[in-house]
Amino acid sequence: SVAGLMPGGPYMATYYATKSYVVSLTNALAEELKRLGSHAQVHALCPGPVNTEFNDVANVKFSLKGISARECVSHCIDEADKGKIIIVPNMMVKAAVIASKFVPREIVLGILARSQKSKIER
């Protein structure tokens, strides 16, 4: 999940923390495999919103426009074939992740808090 690339997630702290763990673990394992000279690869897919039936069933609403499952898988395979470790297939999500690195943490956390709280209040 793209949550693993963000500084935290008010109102969803456990979710964001576990996703950050997965990203950290993936980076560590990739480096270990590289140093061992292994041909095995490890990747973390951090897609952001993906348009699936689950969203309708769970009544999930996203702040950013989602991508199709087919687009997500296609991008993931292409990036994995290139040796990319952390894969973010949605360009809008990728832009948000990059922006979050340059914006003060308090502002990013405030934006995430408002977004998550609005979902809780629906």
In which residue ranges do the predicted regions lie?
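Residue(s) in the substrate-gating loop at a strand-loop-helix junction
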Residues: 1
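Active-site-adjacent segment of SDR/Rossmann-fold oxidoreductases
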Residues: 6-7, 28-40
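Active-site loop-to-helix junction immediately N-terminal to the catalytic Tyr of the SDR YXXXK motif
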Residues: 7-14
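Short, flexible catalytic-loop segment of classical short-chain dehydrogenase/reductase
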Residues: 47-57, 61-62
